[in-house]
Design a protein with these regions (language model features):
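Hydrophobic residues within well-ordered alpha-helices
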Residues: 89-90, 211-215
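Bacterial signal peptide processing site
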Residues: 26-29
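N-terminal export leaders
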Residues: 6-10
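Paired acidic/hydrophobic, glycine-rich loop segments that form the ligand-binding mouth/hinge
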Residues: 95-99, 219-225
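C-terminal motif of bacterial Sec signal peptides marking the signal peptidase cleavage site
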Residues: 21-24
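A bilobed periplasmic-binding-protein/Venus flytrap-type ligand-binding module shared by bacterial periplasmic
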Residues: 144-154, 249-262
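Ligand-binding "clamshell"
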Residues: 108-135, 218, 230-243
Length: 272
């Protein structure tokens, strides 16, 4: 990884603080996980990340704790969305990547039954490909959201996603184009909340371009992580999701089962 990228990650992350946040009150590992993998020097551990800044920060935390534990690490960051990186970890090109429980479950289970963080984990163990497993989930989440401006919320009395129907017509949402096919995208908005919506693609994963599209009135709604400083900086309103359209997205390491036990223990020490 280029030195400038490494410095940017460490500066933005406040690495020690982020590690502590990830480690707080973990949700636990699979009690039936196999412990028979053997530590070996058979090639580097490949740590991947999504094309999303906070995911890259978490991936770098994993990479550094693995190196501290004595493993050789190859970094493959900014890979893209699940349609790209999940086939790579399934094939063995990637060893570990930070994931988000609810989104990962909805990728593999088209009609999941889970509604909370614990049941998301339980169901994941039943649907993941045979060579993959998850380690301990953190209490920390990185949720998707449906967010509006304060002016829009006040004008239409919006507090919940269901209230978007008050806008009338087709609601426009600034978000990555992938949201158009996600279960909690337009199809989910219609089936769960009766809201007619369409995606206005902005490919920066809730970043400045997405925020600008919302604040300048280009769109009605934006998918911005609730943890983003842009929420408070722009006095935005994250709409409530009483029907759990968006499942809990606790940060969860997705790993190959062949990962050495020592490596999984090192990741678990900061992940959960």
């Amino acid at each position: 990884m280029p030195p400038t990228t490494r410095r940017r990650i460490l500066a933005v992350a406040g690495l020690t603080a982020v590690t502590g946040a990830l480690g707080a009150c973990g949700l636990g590992r699979d009690p039936f996980a196999s412990e028979d993998s053997e530590d070996s020097g058979a090639g580097p551990i490949v740590v991947g990340s999504q094309q999303y800044y906070s995911n890259e920060i978490i991936a770098e935390i994993y990479a550094q704790v693995l190196e501290t534990a004595g493993y050789t690490v190859t970094r493959e960051y900014q890979i893209g969305q699940r349609e790209i990186y999940l086939p790579q970890i399934e094939s063995g090109d990637i060893s570990v990547i930070p994931e988000y429980g609810g989104n990962l479950l909805q990728y593999y289970a088209k009609d999941p039954e889970a509604t909370d963080a614990g049941s998301v984990r339980e169901e994941l163990f039943t649907v993941l490909p045979r060579d993959l497993t998850i380690l301990g989930s953190a209490e920390a989440t990185d949720q998707d959201s449906y967010t509006v401006t304060r002016a829009t919320a006040d004008a239409y009395g919006l507090t919940s996603i269901a209230d978007l129907a008050e806008l009338g017509g087709t609601v426009t949402i600034a978000a990555n184009s992938e949201l158009a096919t996600r279960p909690y995208g337009p199809s989910g908005l219609m089936s769960v909340y009766g809201v007619d919506a369409m995606i206005d693609p902005v490919e920066d994963t809730g970043g400045p371009l997405t925020v600008n599209a919302l604040t300048d009135g280009t769109v009605n709604v934006a998918n911005i992580p609730p943890s983003s400083p842009a929420i408070t900086d722009n006095d935005l309103v994250v709409l409530e999701d009483p029907k759990n359209l968006i499942l809990p997205e606790n940060v969860t390491p997705l790993v190959r089962k062949s990962l050495p036990v020592g490596a999984t223990q090192a990741i678990d020490a900061v992940a959960a």
